[in-house]
Amino acid sequence: MSQQLKIIVGSKNPVKINAAKHIFTMYFPECIIDCEGVNAPSGVPDQPIGADETRIGAQNRVNYCKKHHHAHYYVAMEGGAEQFSYGAATFAYVVIDNALNQVVGRSSNLPLPQVLYNALLKGEELGDVMDKAFNTTNVKQKGGAIGLLTNNHATRESTYTQALTLAMAPFLHPELYGQTN
């Protein structure tokens, strides 16, 4: 009989739930993966600006999940944006926690058109900005800005999946990550 692995995701967004389920199914093929999304407050603005605000949002979601739910792993993803010296970009922070260790990872950057980033600075969420620019509906629960700007060669889910895949490394090799010398 297969062991069941309970995963709590700090969001009800199907893109985030699917990304988490994908990586746990990949890393634990012998297990039955029970992946549930829950509403978890980020404690940051709906559209985080800057790396720190984005990371803190993901960590807050995971910490809320740990406090209010019981699971083998807790996962959160938070999308943010920032103005860099080379231009505006969007990215995500991911956090995975198994009650013993908490690992923070980050996705790659997607360059953002300056006009779209400026709308974020005025308080709009990226999903809403993209829906207006591309005449779409609720793109944040589909391919996201990433899908729209890459002509669907990458998507919000594929980007979360890659970041989560990399963030799992310390859980897979704890003997190496626990060493300091």
Predicted stretch roles:
Residues 46-181:
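Anionic-ligand binding patches
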Residues 2-71:
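N-terminal polybasic phosphate/anion-binding patch
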